[in-house]
Amino acid sequence: MAAQKVGLLFGGRSGEHEVSIRSAAAIASALADPSNRDRYQVLPFYIDKEGGWHSGETAAQVLANQKPLFVEEPSDRWQFPADCRDVEVWFPILHGPNGEDGTIQGLLTLMQRPFVGSGVLGSALGMDKIAMKQAFAQASLPQVAYVAVNRSQVFSDPCRYTSLLEQIETELGYPCFVKPANLGSSVGIAKVRDRAELEAALDQAAALDRRLIIEAAIDNPREVECAVLGNDYPQASILGEITYDSDFYDYETKYTDGKAQLLIPAQLSAELQQKLQELAIAAFQAVDASGLSRLDFFLDSQGQIFINEINTLPGFTALSMYPQLWAASGVAFPDLVHRLIQLALER
């Protein structure tokens, strides 16, 4: 049987461009593994920071160097490489806005080719934290209290703005977290302890996104993650825990070597682990996810569980939590990539 042509799509216009390149390089290496070499042929497609598409040698060079392409003159963003037609199944590994929010998934759907990961609905719900929480609430999943805010409320007349501040203080209190609803990698998130910090954080978040979410803080929570794999009958991995010395798991902590430690497996009772796995699958199904997702949870000092979020297209470097959780669960990286492609073809 001829090798299937896999369109490996990476880069993108989000702030997670470099992470996407590293994820794609790891996936390309897994597809070159002896177990996959005869099954798949990789066709790399790179989207530069201006939105231009590149294929062939240019995309392969970015993949090999693991460095973004410097574009002197933006290419025609409406012109897709001709070899897109050769792709039999797509593996998009674009992180952040335009990559995991349903945008690229809609384009691939129009191309009438199968692709790895969630469809338009699951991706959109997984990206927008407000819509995500509404879906979780519908499924009766445990969450911290939150207030949803539009940018217009932040930049409104003083009376309405003061009313918003009072609502947040009454319903959530301090400390609390202010987050843009549609940005990944903890970008724009701030922990606030008084009204002055709240106002500054709202201004910062509203400059980044039209939709904001403010969440009640949990005192010194444990942060536990679970990987999910599958379509209609998903499976959950063992659990992992993230530990760090900073005030919360912010962008700097997430992407600076040595600032955070991954503990796999997490030290949890068998009963608690089973409960978290069940909740991970329930959350996966609540947003109509498919293929893969990583579920993030908080545990308070009493052992109470709160679901934080779902990431429908998690980091995929060899050091990322998602593949590490599956490796610890007995699924090696090359086999994980193979399974994801097969799940795309089955859907």
Swiss-Prot record:
GO terms for cellular component: cytosol. The keyword Signal does not apply. Residues 133-342 form the ATP-grasp domain. The lineage of its organism: Bacteria, Bacillati, Cyanobacteriota, Cyanophyceae, Synechococcales. It comes from the Bacteria. Gene3D superfamilies: 3.40.50.20, ATP-grasp fold, A domain, ATP-grasp fold, B domain. Cell wall formation. It is an enzyme of class 6 (ligase). It comes from Synechococcus elongatus (strain ATCC 33912 / PCC 7942 / FACHB-805). PANTHER family: D-ALANINE--D-ALANINE LIGASE, D-ALANINE--D-ALANINE LIGASE A. This is D-alanine--D-alanine ligase. Its EC number is 6.3.2.4.
